[in-house]
Amino acid sequence: MIYQMQMPAKIDVDEATHTGSFGRFIAQPLERGYGVTLGNAMRRVLLASLPGTAITGIKIDGVFHEFSTIDGVREDVPEIVLNLKKVRFKSNCKRSCKTTLTLAGPKDFLAGDIVAQEGEFEVLNKDLHIATINSEAAVTIDIYIGRGRGYVPAEENRSDGMPIGFIAIDSIYTPIKNVKLTVENTRVGQKTDYEKMILDVETDGSISPDDAISLAGRIINDHVTFFANFSPTEEEYAEEEYKQLDEEFENMRKKLQTKIEDLDLSVRSHNCLRLAEIDTLADLVSRREDELLNYKNFGKKSLTELREALEKEGLKFGMDITRYQMKG
């Protein structure tokens, strides 16, 4: 075990606001600075590294470039492309696929008209408007759909194997619509300089917020593991140093559990501490000197005696012993 740091007891979920596409997750307590450190890492991974499904390109009969217009269709090709970028999919398929649509007017072409030929995917925002086709028009369109991560520009979706008239589209694969990070102060015992990390995660519905958080955490863990398993030239020295830190930590924990009655104190001091319900060294060092002086029959002579007793043990009044306290 490496030197103990304050770790969050668990991740809390705000059940009042939780839905299939939104979740508020709260981690506390964290050491000062770790709210931003962990929160930024989670936010970046959530927004850029989770897999998703998106349209990679289209081919429309009679259209040979992306700046064309289509007879009988109100929207031009650039506007249709912009609308298709917004289509959100739910898919467990790991390969790319193509679906062909033949649309005859009059018709309002909606995202829900994009149907998988073999059930490879499902459109989530079915009511999204794509184009308006008048009564005299008919349009045949091939839609290419792929899996990926984050954002991929149209240039990277072009390849030599595509048919003539293929129009590449920017692919927004990420299933995450928004991530908001908030870091607040929180208290542990008497110490107030710990942090609470709050992550508001909004997805497109293709993945639950819970699964998104879990997947992002695993991605970070997989990367950090390489550093945790790193073996430097001075590995033996590092291990010995960590071992020494662990021993010091355990020794301090045991020392703080020492009963007051086991200390060589005067009867007066023993009685004062007993009346104040101070039973262990942990209880004693967590008090300030001015607090002790407020107890009945507790004077400066007793305070001096206790101060000297603590100094012999390498302790003092007003210590923060949160990290040494047993959990549970």
Swiss-Prot record:
EC no.?
2.7.7.6
Catalysis: reaction(s): RNA(n) + a ribonucleoside 5'-triphosphate = RNA(n+1) + diphosphate
A GO CC annotation recorded here is: DNA-directed RNA polymerase complex
The alphabetized list of GO BP terms reads: DNA-templated transcription
InterPro entries from the UniProt entry:
DNA-dir_RNA_pol_insert, DNA-dir_RNA_pol_RpoA/D/Rpb3, DNA-dir_RpoA, RBP11-like, RNAP_asu_C, RNApol_insert_sf
SMART domains, per the entry = RPOLD
- The region called Alpha N-terminal domain (alpha-NTD) is annotated at 1-231
Location of region: Alpha C-terminal domain (alpha-CTD):
252-328
Task: Tell me yes or no: is Transcription among this UniProt entry's keywords.
Answer: yes
Q: What class of enzyme is it?
A: transferase
Molecular function in Gene Ontology:
DNA binding; DNA-directed RNA polymerase activity; protein dimerization activity
- Name the keywords, alphabetized: DNA-directed RNA polymerase, Nucleotidyltransferase, Transcription, Transferase
UniProt cross-references to HAMAP family, sorted A to Z? RNApol_bact_RpoA
NCBIfam families, alphabetized: PRK05182.1-2, PRK05182.2-5, rpoA
Q: What does the subunit section of this Swiss-Prot or TrEMBL entry state?
A: Homodimer. The RNAP catalytic core consists of 2 alpha, 1 beta, 1 beta' and 1 omega subunit. When a sigma factor is associated with the core the holoenzyme is formed, which can initiate transcription.
Family to which this protein belongs: Belongs to the RNA polymerase alpha chain family.
Briefly, what is this protein's role?
A: DNA-dependent RNA polymerase catalyzes the transcription of DNA into RNA using the four ribonucleoside triphosphates as substrates.
What free text does the record give on domains? The N-terminal domain is essential for RNAP assembly and basal transcription, whereas the C-terminal domain is involved in interaction with transcriptional regulators and with upstream promoter elements.
Question: What name has this protein been given in UniProt?
Answer: DNA-directed RNA polymerase subunit alpha
This protein's species is: Chlorobaculum parvum (strain DSM 263 / NCIMB 8327)
Organism phylogeny: Bacteria, Pseudomonadati, Chlorobiota, Chlorobiia, Chlorobiales
Name of encoding gene = rpoA
